[in-house]
Amino acid sequence: MSMKSKFMYVGIRVTDLERSIDFYTNTLGMKVSGRSKIEQTKGETVGLQTEKDGFTLELNYYEKDSPYNTKYVVGEGLDHLAFKVDDLDKALEEAKKAGHRTILQMKADGGRWAYIEDPDGNWIELF
């Protein structure tokens, strides 16, 4: 018999906490749901939630002298995060105005989606 579980959130490491909070709140419209300093890791964590469905993204930042502040490698084990938006063209225009470049735009099977980068280079899918 397997364990019963419920998926709760995704945590990503960031190199500049305030810059990342700005991106996820001002570009993607998420809201800060919590913030904590963690002495054991010499770090800080910030919870962000989407308004529509309550999805939670956890941003994890570690001070320079933290043993958890290791070389940052974009994409190691993480492909992308996806967000549904009301208007893809408007979302891309707003991201561009905020200084975030569109990496790729796709069309297939009657759908459209695009990828932008967060401040640490993680790919963010908008559809």
What are these regions (language model features)?
Residues 19, 88-92:
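Short, conserved charged micro-motifs
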Residues 16, 87, 118:
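Acidic di-acidic motifs
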Residues 14-17, 39-40:
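Conserved beta-strand-loop-alpha-helix junction that forms the acyl-donor binding cleft
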Residues 34, 126-127:
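Short beta->alpha transition motifs characteristic of CBS
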Residues 11-13, 82-86:
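Short hydrophobic/aromatic beta-strand micro-patches
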Residues 1-8, 31-82, 92-117:
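Vicinal oxygen chelate
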Residues 20-25, 95, 121:
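Conserved active-site tyrosine of GNAT-family acetyltransferases
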